[in-house]
Amino acid sequence: MGKLNKTEREWQRELSPEEYRITRQKGTEPAFTGQYWNTKQSGTYVCRCCGTELFSSISKYDSGCGWPSFYKPINTTAIEEHDDFSHGMVRTEIVCHHCDAHLGHVFEDGPQPTGLRYCVNSASLQLKTDEKNDEETYP
């Protein structure tokens, strides 16, 4: 599947102002405010902009940081990583492979088995719940 190319005007029409600010302008929502920071429902988290599957609720955990956190993406091609030197910091930005939506950042302070923490803005995600099993996936 190739890259999804839309104009900024198209993105602005399709997304809420907050979703646009975060996904297209590399914004960040305040900690502990996003829709999914504390969600424990089972399902698949997809890109808010294009619907690409990004994370499974199985890999979601409570990192205490106030943003949805995952220890791995749903597959190795769903996400791209880029160096981010903004705000006087050195970080690794994560974006959707299909549409380049800004998702958040990945840090090397997560749990095993990966040791990684994919820290993602809720506004970048949409949860597609499992219809068969809508129970909590982590304590």
UniProtKB/Swiss-Prot annotation:
Assigned keywords, A-Z: Metal-binding, Oxidoreductase, Zinc
Enzyme class label: oxidoreductase
Highest taxon of source: Bacteria
Keyword Lipid metabolism included in the entry's annotation: no
Pfam families, alphabetized: SelR (PF01641)
Required cofactor(s): Zn(2+)
GO CC aspect terms: cytoplasm
The EC number(s) this enzyme carries: 1.8.4.12
Gene Ontology annotations of biological process type: protein repair; response to oxidative stress
InterPro entries in the cross-refs: Met_Sox_Rdtase_MsrB, Met_Sox_Rdtase_MsrB_dom, Mss4-like_sf
Active site residues according to the UniProt entry: C119 (nucleophile)
UniProt keyword Zinc, yes or no: yes
GO molecular function, one term: peptide-methionine (R)-S-oxide reductase activity
Record's catalysed reaction(s): L-methionyl-[protein] + [thioredoxin]-disulfide + H2O = L-methionyl-(R)-S-oxide-[protein] + [thioredoxin]-dithiol
MsrB domain location: 8-130
Cofactor info, note text: Binds 1 zinc ion per subunit. The zinc ion is important for the structural integrity of the protein.
Residues that bind Zn(2+): C47, C50, C96, C99
Family recorded in the similarity comment: Belongs to the MsrB Met sulfoxide reductase family.
Descriptive protein name: Peptide methionine sulfoxide reductase MsrB
